[in-house]
From Swiss-Prot:
This is Urease accessory protein UreE. Involved in urease metallocenter assembly. Binds nickel. Probably functions as a nickel donor during metallocenter assembly. Residues 171-202 are annotated as: Disordered. Belongs to the UreE family. NCBIfam families: PRK13261.1-1 (NF009751), PRK13263.1 (NF009762). SUPFAM superfamilies: Urease metallochaperone UreE, C-terminal domain, Urease metallochaperone UreE, N-terminal domain. InterPro entries: UreE (IPR012406), UreE_C_dom (IPR007864), UreE_N (IPR004029), UreE_N_sf (IPR036118).
Amino acid sequence: MRTLDKRIAPNVKLAASLVARAPTLTLAYDARCKSRLAATLDTGEDVAVVLPRGTVLRDGDVLVADDGALVRIAAAPETVLLVRAGDPLTLMRAAYHLGNRHTPVEIGDGYLKLEADPVLADMLRRLGTQVEPTSAPFQPEAGAYGGGHKHGHDATFAEDYALAQQVFGEHHGHSHSHDHDHDHDHQHGPGCTHGHRGHDHH
């Protein structure tokens, strides 16, 4: 089995013909956050991905195998929420509230995109946005800090999310119980906050 153990820096320009001939490894966002991964190229070949801890792969990245061959990374379509608003201020408010909850968000021209979450979808609709579940590649913003950062869910996060859950439960006639007394103090790579949507911890 070949091992993909190097990522070519984004500022290094490769010949387009080389990249075009490279096989593709299509991965969802959670998989692109993992530094150790068993995966299958689109050609059907099984490979091992072994990268420095904290590496977050993006669509279009190029990896180098231990035999010198190139492999191109593609972001796989996955279930996401596409968020739009009638005015920029409403969309900005939505982005603020999502950021306050440490939610990975892709920011585009007139839209936000996040992993599917019924509690957050309900909150976003209450803020006045239009929320549409769809299947699309997900590429959230990289973190503002250069290296991996360490944090747990603080009291503000727990209170905010508990309130969101309560509102969701009242609106839908049922509630979702999610414990937050377990430890979340672990390392993440830059911009990689998967598993911190409050109730989907892997």
